[in-house]
A protein has these predicted regions:
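Active-site nucleophile elbow and catalytic-triad environment of alpha/beta-hydrolase enzymes
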Residues: 51, 115-133
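Gly/Ser-rich "nucleophile elbow"/oxyanion-hole loop immediately N-terminal to the catalytic nucleophile
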Residues: 1-11, 15, 32, 67, ...
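Conserved alpha/beta-hydrolase "acid-adjacent" motif
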Residues: 145, 150-156
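Short beta-strand/loop motif that positions the catalytic acidic residue
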Residues: 136-137, 143-145
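Alpha/beta-hydrolase-fold catalytic nucleophile elbow
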Residues: 13-15, 36-39, 174
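Alpha/beta-hydrolase-fold enzymes
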Residues: 21-101
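Gly/Ala-rich beta-loop-alpha elbow adjacent to hydrolase catalytic centers
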Residues: 14-18, 22
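Catalytic histidine-centered segment of alpha/beta-hydrolase-like enzymes
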Residues: 175-189
Length: 202
């Protein structure tokens, strides 16, 4: 451990997919003393089923399997867009995902590429960090959920939070998934800062 790190004051903060990481890590690593999961992915397969129409799901699974077989056979790595206009295939198929990534790419991240590997999507679907959410306790756990989140659905996050043990705190902020980053930044950042300060600075 680096000398500037206080091992008794290690806190984790994650948002969206990285929230999955902090949930999983804090369930098993007691060095973590406080954790905040913002607009979290809690169960990738359940989440994916919300984003893909039921009648298209078997074809999507077959497409992922075909990509895997093709990669093993040819070594070729295939890509798909992270976001795309409605009706086109993308890893994050919600309208607010398209709006946010497109705007952010233009204004704040001009070198960002709108692509990810198909294999990454398939592997991500195996991720179920909330299966172990009950093991986070006694580490203080805060979950920040957007009231109208359609990318990492609000009800999935709240259900996972219900299975966590004390000490815990649920914060519900107005808006959708991406409001936590811009329009609703203060409503998300302030409780997170207070939670980390309360449990790491005492």
């Amino acid at each position: 451990m680096q000398p500037m790190v206080d091992p008794e004051r290690i806190g984790l903060w994650g948002s969206s997919y990285s929230s999955a990481h902090v949930i999983h890590l804090s369930a098993f690593d007691r060095r973590v003393k406080c954790v905040v999961a913002q607009v979290p992915l809690v169960n990738a397969m359940d989440n994916f089923r919300r984003l893909v129409r039921a009648d298209q799901f078997p074809a999507t699974q077959a497409w992922l399997a075909a990509d895997r077989a093709d990669q093993y056979k040819t070594g070729k790595i295939n890509y798909l867009p992270v976001v795309a206009p409605q009706g086109q295939a993308a890893a994050l198929p919600t309208q607010d995902s398209y709006d946010w990534f497109t705007q952010t790419g233009k204004t704040r991240a001009p070198k960002w590429k709108n692509e990810q590997t198909v294999r990454s999507l398939e592997l991500a679907l195996e991720y179920n960090p909330a299966a172990d959410v009950h093991l986070i306790s006694p580490t203080p756990f805060m979950m920040i959920v957007a009231q109208n989140d359609t990318l990492t659905p609000t009800d999935l996050a709240i259900e996972a939070f219900g299975r966590a043990r004390e000490p815990k705190q649920l914060v519900i902020i107005p808006g959708g998934h991406f409001d936590a980053y811009v329009a609703g930044f203060e409503s998300a950042a302030t409780p997170a800062l207070n939670w980390l300060t309360q449990h790491l600075m005492k």
